[in-house]
Amino acid sequence: NYYEMRNIAVSNLMEPGSTFKTASIMVALEDKFITPDYMVDTGNGVVNMHGSNMKDWNWYKGGYGKIDVTRIMEVSSNVGVSSIIDKFYGDNPQKFIDGLKRMSIDKPLNLGFVGEASPRILGPKERYFAKTSLPWMSIGYETMIPPIYMLNFYNAIANNGVMVKPKFVKAIAKDGEIIQEFPTEIVNPKICSDTTLTMIQGILRKVVSQGLAKPAGSKQFSVSGKTGTAQVSQGKAGYKAGGVSYLVSFCGYFPSEAPKYSCMVSIQIPHGPASGGLQAGSVFSRIAERIYAKHLYQDLASAKDSTSIIIPEVKNGDLREASYVLQNLNIQ
């Protein structure tokens, strides 16, 4: 018999990886440093950032070269996102941190679960904040965020910028009578401007329709979201102790034009290869389609039974035999 010892969604502090890039890009959009068509030269997929190499997943193929912000998100370019954040916030990292906090991504939700964890976002005044911290933070490292917080952030994007506290119980009833109700609690009434919201919603939709997150999509409805693939840290032992382990994820919502559901899939892969789009995205797609199918209704008036089908003319033959067959089929 197997059972979960703890609720991973609320207690698992993890480095979110590329799902965090959405927050980074939103901060830069909100500060008006960039637009979706802002161009970045990602070169051959490798760039030295303060003594350490930042790599794109396809660096061995020559990288992506010059691409705009939308394409950066579609292909989840580490070089693209980190170059933007390092360029505009390198001299003032606190401005970037303030932008994240403005969106309430780290605000404690106080959900009431045993072992509930809260996000940890490193600040420039802290002991271990180095020159490399900002660019690596922008792509989802050096930051610890429980899955429920990441999902709540994407849900706010889907909810027109309104961040609400996750609610697991709407009301308590006894003998058919409601004895207690739990109203919706607003965490942040507006995580960003309408302009930024419209831009990031458009970007996240394209990430699925024409980016690496295509496996998360559906032919039945539109999906928006972002993939994530992060190496799992073994604490003081680093990222490669005992072999490289990955956390692949996809966080998004559907249908894109009128969101009803948000969902996050996280899978820990003991060994490579790992792909947030292919592995977590495919699971997301199956979950989304099953949920969507539960709310499909057919108009009874449009449903046809066998007696409503137009019967073709009877071929030439014996009239009595044809009449006998038709009568037994209840066809007049």
Indicate where each model-derived feature is located.
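Short, gly/Ser/Thr-rich active-site loops of penicillin-recognizing serine hydrolases
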Residues: 178-180, 184, 278-331
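Beta-lactam-recognizing serine transpeptidase/beta-lactamase-like catalytic domain environment
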Residues: 1-18, 23-267
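Generic structural signal of hydrophobic/aromatic residues within well-ordered alpha-helices
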Residues: 84, 96, 200, 321-325, ...
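A short, polar/proline- and glycine-enriched secondary-structure boundary/capping micro-motif
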Residues: 190-193, 273-277
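Short beta-strands and strand-coil junctions in structured, solvent-facing domains, enriched
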Residues: 271-273, 293
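Alpha-helical protein-protein interaction elements
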Residues: 128, 213, 242-246, 276, ...
